[in-house]
Structures are given as structure tokens and as C-alpha cells.
């Protein structure tokens, strides 16, 4: 991608405050803006498969699987000048582009269909990813792989009514915590973790087809 659009680094108050002085935005202490000065290249591959198994009088099983592996690197940064003491796209932002998402992802699912029943189990695995410190490589952190399981059980009645119950992230999986970072004494999670840090979500639902 040439001229890829991405957010800049966060500009500190020493840069931002003088710019907004005397305006309604004088209380702003930091800012970032969109820029398109980076050129990137992504290489990788994706695989997908499907298999259907008939169970005779016990319905049918549908299996699906997928695997994707990608690598993105910055091939060039346009020279558009600089802000004293700051980089427009610095080490942290470059890390978000190159290492901020998992290098690979695996998805597996099985769906059992029998009369009005439908039971689906889905599994996702996110590979390792990294967060770079803006100034100190020694503070970079590599986050381990994460497995997430979903479950949905539903029954459809003849009249069009469907009852469902299930869970997203059934086993309450969480990503690795940020090393040394806490908010009010509670360990923090990275905002770029692929599955978030909300944990398990359980639900029931009712739907009707007219």
C-alpha cells in the first residue's frame, strides 16, 4: 500500500498547548492526526476448508476451518519534515503497523443440525503479537497466543419461533496483561488486543419468523 493512512504518534503538551492557546480547545494536552506518509507491504496466505458429515437418523455435522498468516512491514516513510523533539510516525506507531496484530489466526467450528436443533461450537486462536515502547526497546512486550471458544445452542419450533442460548468466549479467556501497567491498582490490558479484555459474555435470545 502506497501512502497508507495511519494515525501519527501522540504529540505531547509541549507541542499541542501553544497551538491551541487562546482557542476553545486550550485544555487539550495531547493530539494525534491522520497521515499518509508510510508505504507498506503485506505478504501472506489464507486457507479455508469445509466438510459435511451425514449422521443418518441423527442429523448432520458441518465442519469449517480456516488459517491465515500475514506479515506487514514498512517499506518507506516520506520525508515531510519533523516536529522538534518528536516523530510523526515514531517507534510505537511503526510497531502498531508491523507487529500490532497477530501474525496468524486459526478458526475451527462444528455445527450439528438435527430436526429443529442447531448446536455450534467455534474455536479461535490468535497468534503472538507485540507492543513497542515509544522510546525504549527494553520495554517492548510480546503477548502470547490466545484461544477463544464460542457456543450456541438453539431450537426452532415448527411455527417459526427459535429459542437460543450460548456464550461468546465461553471459558472467559483473557489476553496477557501489560507488564507493570496499572490503573487504580488494577492491572491493565492492551487496547490493541485482538479479542479485547471483556471476558465471557453469556446470552439467551428469542426470535420469530413471520
Language model region names:
Residues 1-133:
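Gram-negative outer-membrane beta-barrel transporters
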Residues 35-40, 140-143, 193:
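Outer-membrane beta-barrel proteins
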Residues 40, 113, 146, 156-158, ...:
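A short, compositionally biased micro-patch
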Residues 71, 123-132, 154-210:
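C-terminal beta-signal and adjacent terminal beta-strands/loops
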Residues 92-96, 139, 186, 191:
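Peri-catalytic substrate-binding/gating loops that frame the active-site cleft of hydrolases
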Residues 103-107, 146-150, 201:
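Transmembrane beta-barrel architecture of outer membranes
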Residues 123-125, 132-149:
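Generic long, charged, amphipathic alpha-helical segments
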Amino acid at each position: 500500500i502506497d501512502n497508507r493512512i495511519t494515525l501519527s504518534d501522540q504529540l505531547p503538551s509541549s507541542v499541542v498547548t501553544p497551538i491551541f492557546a487562546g482557542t476553545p480547545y486550550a485544555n487539550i494536552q495531547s493530539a494525534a492526526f491522520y497521515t499518509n506518509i508510510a508505504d507498506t507491504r503485506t505478504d501472506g496466505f489464507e486457507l479455508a476448508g469445509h466438510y459435511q458429515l451425514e449422521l443418518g437418523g441423527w442429523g448432520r455435522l458441518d465442519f469449517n476451518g480456516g488459517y491465515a498468516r500475514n506479515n506487514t512491514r514498512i517499506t518507506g516513510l516520506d520525508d515531510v519534515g519533523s516536529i522538534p523533539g518528536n516523530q510523526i510516525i515514531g517507534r510505537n506507531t511503526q510497531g502498531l503497523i508491523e507487529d500490532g496484530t497477530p501474525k496468524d489466526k486459526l478458526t475451527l467450528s462444528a455445527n450439528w443440525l438435527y430436526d429443529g436443533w442447531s448446536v455450534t461450537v467455534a474455536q479461535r486462536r490468535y497468534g503472538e503479537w507485540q507492543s513497542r515502547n515509544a522510546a525504549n526497546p527494553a520495554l517492548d512486550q510480546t503477548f502470547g497466543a490466545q484461544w477463544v471458544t464460542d457456543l450456541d445452542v438453539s431450537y426452532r419450533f415448527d411455527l417459526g419461533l427459535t429459542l437460543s442460548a450460548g456464550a461468546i468466549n465461553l471459558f472467559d479467556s483473557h489476553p496477557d496483561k501489560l507488564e507493570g501497567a496499572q490503573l487504580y491498582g488494577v492491572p491493565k490490558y492492551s487496547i490493541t488486543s485482538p479479542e479485547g479484555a471483556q471476558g465471557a459474555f453469556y446470552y439467551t435470545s428469542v426470535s420469530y419468523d413471520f
